[in-house]
Amino acid sequence: MGKVPFNDPTVEELLQITEEGLRKYLDPAVETVLTVGNYIVGGGGKRLRPLLLLLFAKGLGVPQTILLEKTLPLAVGIEYIHTASLLHDDVVDEAETRRGKEAAHRIFGNGVAVLTGDYMYANALYLYALYGNQKMIEVVSQAVKLMAEGQVLELKKVGELIDEGTYFQIIDGKTSALFAASTAVGALAAQQENWQIYWDFGLKLGRAFQLIDDALDYEGDEKQVGKPIGQDLKEGKTTYPLLSVLENLNLEEVKKVLSSPNGDGYKKIVLLVKELGGVEKTKERARGELQAAREILNKVPLNGEVKRMLNQILDFVVERTY
């Protein structure tokens, strides 16, 4: 459940200043908001999104002093947005745990969790108003819109057997959009006008990240993943491992499981999906997205050291077990 596991001094430094920034810029006047904020921020996380933002900015030439003074708050803002989405998602999903700990809403209540999430969103936009520019605000706001749309679409499709197009529409919104904003803002911080290509990189990385998340839901270690195996299917959600082997399954049985949340029928489907190769097919699709991301990396003017680190991150995304 921890951060990106690299023994690279540059990555370690960027992760360290991110942690310091997350504490520094979380300064609400109401103690309860601070308590909940510290609980969720202190609960761990990979910090991939802020790391990507800082790496792109650094690799495209942002000086260290500017990186610390003006770019770091933008990276922190991205992580606040991610944190806010987790607070809200756990309330919507009635989740019991998050990152191996009891979900915030179960400790502090739904109302406090939701409103703290609202504060985190507002604080992120405040940081962008102070340290960013108009285009950055547009990019991040668009990502938040897409996140909300993806979450609503997923919620409306619970209990239904969706097609592949709808699946990618959901994950491009709920997951990929914030990765895309992270890499695009990093490029914008370095005065790159063609920010869309950096958005596309983040989008493909985000797709791969969610695909692996969905694979881990079928075969991961519960302690490492931080939630029970088969949880998505149990909640009535169709994800790629299931879609990839659907032609070999009894559709009526699958539909019955999806439409009966929290029953026990999902366990049989989880085993069948694994036996039919659904997990490996999902990982293969993720590798395809990452290959497309690598091709983008080869086209952009990043320095060699940062390009190497980003390729390591792409390796981590597909090989991770949490």
Functional labels for PLM-detected ranges:
Residues 1-322:
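All-alpha prenyltransferase/terpene-synthase fold signal
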